């Protein structure tokens, strides 16, 4: 076989592989988009129902020692955005956000301190995850001026969220849950054939603190 024929053979194999890959991508995109549409409708309806119910929120603490008051979930809002993928309009993400506020009365002020890096990092991550308004204050020795601790003065008001991002090429949905079972973020993925009403019901149960097999 001449060298040119070898190149032709190599090009033909690559072309066949590319066509098979494109066919697989198109199939995955179609299935994923259909699933994403169903999920968007579910999330929109879920937000409406939860706005009426205003379920109890998770137990919250920034340092693991200082509990927040009993919280409730309210002001649920759903959203969905689209993008263009291979000349086709598809879902970019599906989301729902909500407020976490005290069950009784208005948000109140609180304070936590840390003087070890791991504790400091944990508190900062939780403040960031919850979108908690706060002020960071360095506590120093009155005479030596050495740093003794870092204090965070905060208000007991936070945000929770659910973001679902379709991966059309891989045929899966990526779920990001923020502040659902306390401060923190959970990320996980499910293939689209697993994302049925039963799974979404388990997700809804998890969001409002009921026993769930979603994670």
Spell out what each predicted region is.
Residues 1-215:
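A composition-biased, non-transmembrane "mature-region" signal
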């Amino acid at each position: 076989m001449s060298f040119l024929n070898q190149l032709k053979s190599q090009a033909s194999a690559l072309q066949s592989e590319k066509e098979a890959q494109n066919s697989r991508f198109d199939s995955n995109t179609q299935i994923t988009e259909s699933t994403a549409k169903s999920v968007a409708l579910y999330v929109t309806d879920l937000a409406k129902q939860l706005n009426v119910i205003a379920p109890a929120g998770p137990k919250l603490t920034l340092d693991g020692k200082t509990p927040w008051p009993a919280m409730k979930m309210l002001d649920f809002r759903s959203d969905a955005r689209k993008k263009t993928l291979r000349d086709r309009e598809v879902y970019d993400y599906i989301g729902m956000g909500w407020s976490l506020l005290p069950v009784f009365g208005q948000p109140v002020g609180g304070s936590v301190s840390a003087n070890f890096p791991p504790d400091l990092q944990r508190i900062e991550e939780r403040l960031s995850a919850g979108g908690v308004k706060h002020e960071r204050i360095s506590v120093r020795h009155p005479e030596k001026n050495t740093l003794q601790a870092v204090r965070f003065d905060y208000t007991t008001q936070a945000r929770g969220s659910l973001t679902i991002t379709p991966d059309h090429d891989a045929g899966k949905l990526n779920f990001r849950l923020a502040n659902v079972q306390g401060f923190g973020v959970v990320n996980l993925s499910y293939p689209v054939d697993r994302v049925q009403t039963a799974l979404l019901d388990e997700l809804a149960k998890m969001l409002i603190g009921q026993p769930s097999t979603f994670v």
